C-alpha cells in the first residue's frame, strides 16, 4: 500500500459525511514535518488521528500526520512556520489553518498568528512574564486562549482586536495591527478572497465551479488547485475587478459579486521597482509615454477613453497620475493614451537587468507541459534519466525545481548541480526508487512521474532527447510487403504473378512507353525493374514485362500486417516549440500525423484539415464555400512539404461533403477510399462530448499557412498557444463579445503567435494524459497574430455527437 492508498483513504474520509473537522486543516499529501515536540499514536483512521490532535492537553497540537501503511498517527506542536517539511511516501500532513494564518476574522478572538509588535512598534511582553507588567491574562489563568510567547492575542474578546502587554514600562498594553482575513471582506481586487458568499450583485445564485451546467467554462478546479475554486463561492481567478461567479441563470453567464472591502491595509505586494522586472506588475516608476510616443491618459480620467482600470477598482496597483502600470497581468506596463485613435499601448520601461535577480524570480511556477508521446523510459532507479517528461502518475504538472511555489524545498539546481534539475522535468536527485517531482498542486507535495522502466532493449534518455523516429513503414521489410494498394511500395520484387521478369522502367524494349519512366515520375520510385504502382492502380504493384506478347502484368506482393497506431499518438516526437506559426517553428517531419492538406483538384493547397478516422477528415465549413461538389477537392496525408511532395504521401479524392446543419464553421469530408494508417498518417482523437478545455491549457496549432515572410515557408509549422477562457476573450479590449459558446480562443495576447490564412480548417490539439485530442478547428481571427486579438477555433467537443452520427450513418 503506497501513495495511492493514502489518497484513497483521504478521499473516502472527506466524502464520508464526517469530514467537517478537516475543513479547519490544510492537508498536503506526501509531506512530513520535522518535529521535536510530538507524540506517536496508533489510529485506525484520519478521523481518529484528528480527534487525538484536538484532545491532547500536554502541548498545543498544531499539526498531525497520518501514515497509512502503519496506521500511525503523529501529533505535533510545530507546523511549517516553525519547522521544515520533507518529502515522504505514504503520509498525509494536516496543519491547522488557524496557526498558519497571519490574519484575523472579526475581532480576532481566534487569532493564533505570530505578530509580536503593537501598531506603535513596541515589542510585546511574554504572556508568562511578570515584568515589566504583572498580567491579568496568562497561560496559567487562561489556558485555552493561545497565550504563547509574546504573540498578540485577544483573550478578553476586546472589540478593538488583538493586543498585548508591552515591554515599555510606561505603557501597560497596546493594540496590534493585524490584517483582516479575506473571508468576510476582500483586499485589493479579491484575488485571495476565501469567503463563502455565493450570490452575485443582482442576487443570482452562483453555479458550482466543478459544474458545467448551465454554463460550460474553462475554470476547472482540478486544473487550478491554487485558485481555491470551492463549491459555488465567489472567486477571482482571472484578475477581474472583484470576485465573481458563473450564475445558475441560463441567460446570464457570469456576474460580479458584492464583496465588501476590508478596513485594514492590504498585505504587502513585495518590493517595488523603478525599472522593469518580470512583467512589471511591481513597477512604480514615473514613465508616462508609450512606445509610440503617445502621452498616457490619467488612470482616473475617462476621456478620451472610458475604461474600468481606475484607482477605485484597482486600489492596490498604484494607479497614480498617468504613470505606466500593469494592473491586470499583461506582458508589460501600459496605459491608455491621450490619442483618441489609440486606445492603449505598452510603455518602454528600462530593464532591471543590472540588479540581482533571484533564481526563484526567474523561474516559471508552471512551465508548459512537455510529456513525450513517444514515451521515454529510465534505467535502474532513474538517477540518470534526462528526458522531458513533466507529469506525474495522476496527471499533475510538475513544479519547476528552481521555484518555491507552491512547495518550498531544498532540491534546487544549486544544491544538486549534477542531478539535471532543468525546468520542471522529472528527475531523481535523491536516489528514490524512480523519477519524481514536486507538483503544482498545493495539496500534493510530490508524486512519482508517469514513466516506465526501460526493458532490456530500450535506451533511456540520458541527454536532451533527439527526434525519435520509428522505421518508415514503406521501408522494405524482410517479408517485402505493401500497405493498401501498394502505391508506396518500395520493395525489390521484380517478377509478375506468372513469374515473368519485369522490364526496367528506364528501358524501351521489348515495350516502348513514355508515361511511367523515372524522368516523368521521379517520386514514384521507378528503380531498375522493381514492381511499382505509380498510377495508384487498385490491383496493386505492376510492371512492364519482358514478354513481348504481354505489355504489363501485376506482381504478387503480400499485404503487410496492419500496424497498431493509436489515435493522437504520433510516432515522431513533436518539437513542442513555444514559438509561433507566424515567425515560428518548423515541425519535426510527421510529428503531427493527422495534419491534412486540403487541395483543389489541381493540387493547390488552400486549407488545413484533420484526419479523425481512416475515411473522415474534419475541416472548417468556410473552406468549402467555393464549390459544393466533392470532386472539386482532394486531400494530401503524410506530407511535410507543401510542394515537392514526399514519395510516401497519400493523395485521396473526396467523395462526400457534410456541412454542420446549424451553419457553424465545421464540416466533414468523406474520403473516396480509406487512408492507410502508417507511422506518418495517424488520426487525432476526438474529445468527449461537450468537454471544456481548461483556461490556460497549452495546446498546439499546425499548418502551412501565411508566414508573412518568416523562415520555413512551405514546410509544416507548429505553434504552442494557451487556451483563453471565453469570458476573458470576450472582454472589450480583446474580441468584445464576438466569441460564441461553440467556439474557443487561443493565443498570446501580446501578439506574434497565431494561425493565418491557409491554416483555416486545421487542427488545434491539446495533450491529455498520453495523447493529443482535437479540441479546435481553426476558424477566424481579426488579422493575423495581432496583439489582443487571439485566434478563434470551433469547439469540437460541442459537435462530437453530430460528427459520430454522420460517420455512423454514412
Curated annotation (Swiss-Prot):
* Binding-site residues, L-lysine: 136, 158, 172, 432, 445
Q: Give the matching InterPro entries.
A: Kringle, Kringle-like, Kringle_CS, Kringle_sf, Pan_app, Pept_S1A_plasmin, Peptidase_S1_PA, Peptidase_S1_PA_chymotrypsin
Tissues showing expression: Present in plasma and many other extracellular fluids. It is synthesized in the liver.
Domain named Kringle: which ranges? 103-181, 184-262, 275-352, 377-454, 481-560
Mutation: residue 728 to E; reported impact is: In HAE4; uncertain significance
PAN domain boundaries? 20-98
- Stored CDD domains: KR, PAN_AP_HGF, Tryp_SPc
Q: Please tell me, according to the UniProt entry, what happens when changing residue 741 to A.
A: Proteolytically cleaved, but abolishes plasmin activity and cell detachment. Prevents invasion of the mosquito vector midgut by parasite P.falciparum ookinetes
Site (Cleavage) at 78-79, 466-467, 580-581
**Per the record, what are the reactions this protein catalyses?**
Preferential cleavage: Lys-|-Xaa > Arg-|-Xaa, higher selectivity than trypsin. Converts fibrin into soluble products
The residues annotated as the active site are 622 (charge relay system), 665 (charge relay system), 760 (charge relay system)
Instruction: Give the misc comment.
Output: Plasmin is inactivated by alpha-2-antiplasmin immediately after dissociation from the clot.
Summary of subunit composition and partner proteins: Interacts (both mature PLG and the angiostatin peptide) with CSPG4 and AMOT. Interacts (via the Kringle domains) with HRG; the interaction tethers PLG to the cell surface and enhances its activation. Interacts (via Kringle 4 domain) with ADA; the interaction stimulates PLG activation when in complex with DPP4. Angiostatin: Interacts with ATP5F1A; the interaction inhibits most of the angiogenic effects of angiostatin. Interacts (plasmin) with iripin-8, a serine protease inhibitor from Ixodes ricinus saliva.
Q: What is this protein called?
A: Plasminogen
Q: Which organism is it from?
A: Homo sapiens
Amino acid at each position: 500500500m503506497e501513495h495511492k492508498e493514502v489518497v484513497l483513504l483521504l478521499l473516502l474520509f472527506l466524502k464520508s459525511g464526517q469530514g467537517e473537522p478537516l475543513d479547519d486543516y490544510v492537508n498536503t499529501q506526501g509531506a512530513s514535518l520535522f518535529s521535536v515536540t510530538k507524540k506517536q499514536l496508533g489510529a485506525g483512521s484520519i478521523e481518529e488521528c484528528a480527534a487525538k490532535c484536538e484532545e491532547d492537553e500536554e502541548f498545543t497540537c498544531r499539526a498531525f500526520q497520518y501514515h497509512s501503511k502503519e496506521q500511525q498517527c503523529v501529533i505535533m506542536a510545530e507546523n511549517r512556520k516553525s519547522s521544515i517539511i520533507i518529502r515522504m511516501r505514504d503520509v498525509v500532513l494536516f496543519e491547522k489553518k488557524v496557526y498558519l494564518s497571519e490574519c484575523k476574522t472579526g475581532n480576532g478572538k481566534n487569532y493564533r498568528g505570530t505578530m509580536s509588535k503593537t501598531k506603535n512598534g513596541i515589542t510585546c511582553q511574554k504572556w508568562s512574564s511578570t515584568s515589566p507588567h504583572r498580567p491579568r491574562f496568562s497561560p496559567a489563568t487562561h489556558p485555552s486562549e493561545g497565550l504563547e510567547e509574546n504573540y498578540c492575542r485577544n483573550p478578553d474578546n476586546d472589540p478593538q482586536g488583538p493586543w498585548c502587554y508591552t515591554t515599555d514600562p510606561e505603557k501597560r498594553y497596546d493594540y496590534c495591527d493585524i490584517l483582516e482575513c479575506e473571508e468576510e471582506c476582500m483586499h485589493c481586487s479579491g484575488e485571495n478572497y476565501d469567503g463563502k458568499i455565493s450570490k452575485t450583485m443582482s442576487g443570482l445564485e452562483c453555479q458550482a465551479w466543478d459544474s458545467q451546467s448551465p454554463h460550460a467554462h474553462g475554470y476547472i478546479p482540478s486544473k487550478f488547485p491554487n485558485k481555491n475554486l470551492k463549491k459555488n463561492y465567489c472567486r477571482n481567478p482571472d484578475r477581474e475587478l472583484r470576485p465573481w461567479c458563473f450564475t445558475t441563470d441560463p441567460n446570464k453567464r457570469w456576474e460580479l459579486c458584492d464583496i465588501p472591502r476590508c478596513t485594514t491595509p492590504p498585505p504587502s505586494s513585495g518590493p517595488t521597482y523603478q525599472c522593469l522586472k518580470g512583467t512589471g506588475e511591481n513597477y512604480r516608476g514615473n514613465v508616462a509615454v508609450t512606445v509610440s510616443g503617445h502621452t498616457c491618459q490619467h488612470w482616473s480620467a475617462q476621456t478620451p477613453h472610458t475604461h474600468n482600470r481606475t484607482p477605485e477598482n484597482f486600489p492596490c496597483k498604484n494607479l497614480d497620475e498617468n504613470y505606466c502600470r500593469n494592473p491586470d497581468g499583461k506582458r508589460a506596463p501600459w496605459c491608455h493614451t491621450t490619442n483618441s485613435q489609440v486606445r492603449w499601448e505598452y510603455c518602454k520601461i528600462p530593464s532591471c537587468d543590472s540588479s540581482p535577480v533571484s533564481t526563484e524570480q526567474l523561474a516559471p511556477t508552471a512551465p508548459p507541459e512537455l510529456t513525450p508521446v513517444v514515451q521515454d523510459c529510465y534505467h535502474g532507479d532513474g538517477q540518470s534519466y534526462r528526458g522531458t517528461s513533466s507529469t506525474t502518475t495522476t496527471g499533475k504538472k510538475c513544479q519547476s525545481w528552481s521555484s518555491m511555489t507552491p512547495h518550498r524545498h531544498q532540491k534546487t539546481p544549486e544544491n544538486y548541480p549534477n542531478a539535471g534539475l532543468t525546468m520542471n522535468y522529472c528527475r531523481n536527485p535523491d536516489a528514490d526508487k524512480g523519477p519524481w517531482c514536486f507538483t503544482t498542486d498545493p495539496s500534493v507535495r510530490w508524486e512519482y512521474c508517469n514513466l516506465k522502466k526501460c526493458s532490456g532493449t530500450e535506451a533511456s534518455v540520458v541527454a536532451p532527447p533527439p527526434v525519435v523516429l520509428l522505421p518508415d513503414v514503406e521501408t522494405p521489410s524482410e517479408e517485402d510487403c505493401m500497405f493498401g494498394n501498394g502505391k508506396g511500395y518500395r520493395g525489390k520484387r521484380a517478377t509478375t504473378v506468372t513469374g515473368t521478369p519485369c522490364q526496367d522502367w528506364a528501358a524501351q524494349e521489348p515495350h516502348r512507353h513514355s508515361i511511367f519512366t523515372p524522368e516523368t515520375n521521379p517520386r514514384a520510385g521507378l528503380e531498375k525493374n522493381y514492381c511499382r504502382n505509380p498510377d495508384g492502380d487498385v490491383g496493386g504493384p505492376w510492371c512492364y514485362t519482358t514478354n513481348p506478347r504481354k505489355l504489363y502484368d501485376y506482381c504478387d506482393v503480400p499485404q503487410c500486417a496492419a500496424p497498431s497506431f493509436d489515435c493522437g499518438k504520433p510516432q515522431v516526437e513533436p518539437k513542442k516549440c513555444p514559438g509561433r506559426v507566424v515567425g515560428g517553428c518548423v515541425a519535426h517531419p510527421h510529428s503531427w500525423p493527422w495534419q491534412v492538406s486540403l487541395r483543389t483538384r489541381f493540387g493547390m493547397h488552400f486549407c488545413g484539415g484533420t484526419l479523425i478516422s481512416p475515411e473522415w477528415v474534419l475541416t472548417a465549413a468556410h473552406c468549402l464555400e467555393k464549390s459544393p461538389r466533392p470532386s472539386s477537392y482532394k486531400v494530401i496525408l503524410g506530407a511535410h512539404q507543401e510542394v515537392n511532395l514526399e514519395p510516401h504521401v497519400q493523395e485521396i479524392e473526396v467523395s462526400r461533403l457534410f456541412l454542420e446543419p446549424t451553419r457553424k464553421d465545421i464540416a466533414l469530408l468523406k474520403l473516396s477510399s480509406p487512408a492507410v494508417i502508417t507511422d506518418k498518417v495517424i488520426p487525432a482523437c476526438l474529445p468527449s462530448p461537450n468537454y471544456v478545455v481548461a483556461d490556460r491549457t497549452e495546446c498546439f496549432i499546425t499548418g502551412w499557412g501565411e508566414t508573412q515572410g518568416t523562415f520555413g515557408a512551405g514546410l509544416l509549422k507548429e505553434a504552442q498557444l494557451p487556451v483563453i477562457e471565453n469570458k476573458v476573450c470576450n472582454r472589450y479590449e480583446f474580441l468584445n463579445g464576438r466569441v460564441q459558446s461553440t467556439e474557443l480562443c487561443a493565443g498570446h495576447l501580446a501578439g506574434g503567435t497565431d494561425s493565418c490564412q491557409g491554416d483555416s480548417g486545421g487542427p488545434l490539439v491539446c495533450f491529455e494524459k498520453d495523447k493529443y485530442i482535437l479540441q479546435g478547428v481553426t476558424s477566424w481571427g481579426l488579422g493575423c497574430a495581432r496583439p489582443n486579438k487571439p485566434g478563434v477555433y470551433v469547439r469540437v467537443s460541442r459537435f462530437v455527437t453530430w460528427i459520430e452520427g454522420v460517420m455512423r450513418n454514412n
